[in-house]
Amino acid sequence: MIGIYAGSFDPPTNGHLWIIGQGARLFTKFFVAIGQNSQKEYCFTLDERLEMLEELCIHFDNVEVVHYENKFLVKFAESVGADYILRGIRNEKDYTYERGMRYVNGNMTDTIQTLFMMSPRYLVEVSSSLIKGLVGSDDWEQVVREYVPDTVYYKMLNKFGGIDLSRARKTALEKI
């Protein structure tokens, strides 16, 4: 079975990484797809997000990081032969939105199903929007560190805090 998990991953969070781990266990082949919308503004470039996710997924042999632009996810999923779209659900709002998207996708194709996965309690409040909203406040670094993998944390410090990325990357890789 082939699965796909998509998002903007701007930036990737511990919640994203948890879902990726679940998908890697559930599917024989699992795509992590970065959706790129030319009308949307991002903190991290597509190349930066690809690099971060590739680093985060390096230990999963069956995971491939890809991207797609200006295309419906279900159509992209069809193009890579996916059987399932995996979606993380943190709360009722996520469920309502994702349920609606599942019905829209079902109208476009009946060959791909959506699988909802409930996030564990400790990840319920984690979102890329929350992370970006914290940057710039006093001591944002300590708070953000709780919600993102080390690779992402050091990229954020480099982008928003002016540290030496090569030193930070070496430190992050030593923890792997």
Outline where the language-model segments fall:
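Nucleotidyltransferase catalytic core that binds NTPs
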Residues: 1-176
